[in-house]
């Protein structure tokens, strides 16, 4: 289990908790003449300390089973041989009890990373296909962090730099856009992106400084979308390792919507409102600080990290990430939107 550091009480009181019932539906469109359809559908994770999952039910028209991917995340696998219909649905329903994650993020309690720490978490220091570590990233990370060896202080410097130098695309949707894959290179070049672009850049910088980092994929459970049968998108955040404190979360992407002044108008207001956990936004230094080391309770975790190998192994290359699903038809990737769609509905208990 990923034991992200959290405290039951601190100066702000007890941890907030929330209970949700969710319905996650995947509709797969089947091309004419398809001989084999393979589906890997993200499941709510039972290895996240802030998330308790119960009552999982699966409805599917073909044989299926629960597997784990190369990062240990549970995945529903389904295989359809010689399907005759034009499409089929896979539905999961479950209950999630979420708790807020709150940590002290006290630099005085953190210790410098040792060679043994870096050996233990070596895989979380490596680049991914779209989370690059190159000379440009190393130079920039050195400029931002300098000689700081305290991982919490170094991580906060990187967090603040990203907030000061990158803007979430929803702030200016007419002129900015996200990359289609979640890319360090894109985010650094265009100084914008979505949550995956933000976290890719931050992760590249942190790993370049020897700080083990993971990217966590989930969904916000937004009050405005309660009970609505639609995709509801996904959200991701990061965790970094600090000896003496353990794995600590941050959400630099959503923090950006509370960082500084920016115009709100008819073009961006709804997008901005639907990008945060509770629909609030605008300058709020306390929220910016909160999302370094803390997470709200209005989210569910689907998977972890990038460049995934499925079980059973997919025919295509490593899967970029699994916030929703991955589908292959006759050995080739079947793309989202044209090949399949996901709908997520929830109610709060």
Place the predicted regions along the sequence by residue.
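Conserved helix-loop functional segments at active or binding sites
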Residues: 164-171, 208, 221
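Hydrophobic/aromatic-rich core segments of domains that either
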Residues: 197-314
């Amino acid at each position: 289990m990923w034991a992200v550091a959290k405290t039951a009480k601190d100066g702000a009181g007890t941890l907030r908790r929330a209970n949700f019932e969710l319905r996650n539906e995947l509709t797969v469109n089947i091309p004419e003449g398809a001989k084999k359809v393979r589906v890997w559908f993200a499941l709510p994770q039972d290895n996240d300390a802030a998330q308790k999952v119960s009552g999982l039910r699966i409805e599917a028209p073909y044989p299926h089973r629960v597997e784990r991917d190369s990062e240990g995340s549970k995945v529903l696998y389904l295989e359809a041989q010689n399907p005759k219909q034009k499409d089929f649905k896979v539905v999961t329903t479950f209950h999630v009890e979420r708790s807020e994650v709150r940590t002290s993020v006290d630099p005085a309690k953190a210790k410098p990373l040792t060679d043994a720490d870096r050996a233990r978490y070596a895989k979380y220091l490596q680049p991914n296909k779209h989370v690059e570590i190159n000379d440009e990233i190393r130079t920039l990370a050195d400029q931002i962090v300098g000689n700081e060896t305290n991982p919490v202080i170094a991580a906060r410097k990187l967090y603040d730099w990203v907030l000061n130098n990158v803007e979430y695309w929803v702030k200016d949707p007419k002129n900015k856009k996200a990359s289609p894959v979640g890319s360090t290179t894109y985010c650094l070049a265009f100084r914008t992106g979505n949550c995956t672009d933000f976290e890719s850049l931050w992760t590249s910088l942190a790993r370049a400084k020897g700080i083990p980092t993971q990217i966590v994929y989930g969904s916000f459970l937004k009050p405005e979308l309660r009970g609505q049968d639609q995709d509801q998108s996904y959200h991701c955040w990061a965790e970094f390792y600090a000896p003496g404190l353990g794995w600590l979360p941050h959400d630099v992407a959503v923090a950006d919507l509370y960082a500084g002044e920016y115009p709100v108008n008819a073009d961006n207001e709804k997008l901005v409102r639907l990008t945060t956990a509770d629909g609030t936004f605008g300058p709020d230094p306390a929220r910016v600080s909160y999302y370094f080391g803390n997470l709200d309770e209005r989210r569910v975790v689907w998977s972890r990290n990038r460049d995934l190998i499925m079980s059973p192994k997919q025919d295509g290359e490593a899967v970029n990430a699994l916030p929703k699903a991955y589908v292959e038809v006759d050995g080739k990737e079947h793309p989202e939107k044209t090949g399949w769609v996901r709908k997520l509905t929830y109610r709060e208990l």
